Amino acid sequence: LLMMHSEAHISTVMSPVPLTTLIQERMAALEPLASGRRIEFEFIADDEIHITGIRERLVSLIDNLIENAVKYSPEGGRIEVQLQSRDKSAQLRVSDAGPGIPVELRERVFDRFFRDPNQTQSGSGLGLAIVKAVTQQHNGRVNLSTSAEGGLMVTVDFPNPAFA
């Protein structure tokens, strides 16, 4: 699995992926994980947005983002997933009200197996490394910031062929 995500160039053919629908499908699949901790999902999206990509890898990216948000959110919290068309890109944002990631660690959390030493949650340290690898494979960018709730907001920008 790790090797699959660490390839710099993808040999698999990319095709149009209905990103809005894919995110809705993944949120529905991960709903039991969230409801077990009384966490609410909120999805805000423009109309269907298509990007050129590899569906299976995008599933991995979406699942890692949402699973991390659920893991670090307080019980009874809310996770906001937002998808918008931006300047020549499709922008995916996942925000939670968890502890966030200190600014000084934000670049390092993309390294494989790196974990915030102050975190008590268990994990492999691969989630955000996979997110970054898949984002790069799709010629995108990923950025971490503080959410409005004080947790983490992960922003992924994908090139949108509709604007190319």
What residue ranges belong to the model's regions?
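Short helix-loop "hinge" at the ATP-lid/N-box region of the Bergerat-fold HATPase_c
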Residues: 69-70
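Short beta-strand/loop element within the Bergerat-fold HATPase_c
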Residues: 76-88
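Short conserved segment of the HATPase_c
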Residues: 101-113
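A conserved beta-strand-to-alpha-helix junction within the catalytic ATP-binding
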Residues: 13-28, 42
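Conserved micro-motifs of the catalytic ATP-binding
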Residues: 7-13, 50-53
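Conserved catalytic submotifs in the C-terminal HATPase_c
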Residues: 15-16, 35-36, 40-49, 56
